[in-house]
Structures are given as C-alpha cells and as structure tokens.
Amino acid sequence: MNSEIINVYNVCKHIADNKHSTEVNDLLVEELSELIKAVIKLERYNFCDNTLRCNYHDIYNNIYEELADVIIMICQFIHKNKISHQNLLDEISKKIIRYYETISDK
C-alpha cells in the first residue's frame, strides 16, 4: 500500500478515535446521502434537465468532494466498528469475480 494512503488511513483512524461510534455511523449515512444527491444531479445533467442551475464542471467538483467525504467516513466506519480488513477484502474479491463472470457471459 502506498505510504501516503496509509498515512491518510491512520489520520482517519485517529479522527474516529475521538468520536463515538454512533456519530461515525450517522456521519457516514449523511455523507452517503449527499453523494447520492450529487450522482442524481449528474444523471439529470446527462439527460439534459433544463431545470438544473449548474454546469458540468460544478457537478463534477461536487462529486469529487462528496466521494472524498464518503471515503473518509468509510475509513472511520471500518476502524470504529472493527471491520476485519481481510474479511472485507475477501468479500470485495468475491463480488468482483461474480460481477466479472456476469459480464464475461454476455
């Protein structure tokens, strides 16, 4: 793992250590909902919704910001809730293989 990524994860762990688990969980839900709103706005833009009062650049900047917030909160959630890294990686691997097999069959 890249040392910069490890440092970011360690900072996220330190931040999480100073929060109650309920706060971390609630903030993750909040950040996920903000990302969902940003993705919906992108979809509306892609389908030429004339009621949008923003441009493509603004939408993508918002998506980057919300993705960053979600990733930070996921790191804190993993740490605070003692999610096993190995179990998580195993589950990710299984899902990727299953998704890959699905598209390979087409």
Each language-model region and where it sits:
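Flexible "arm" and connector segments at domain edges
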Residues: 1-67, 71-106
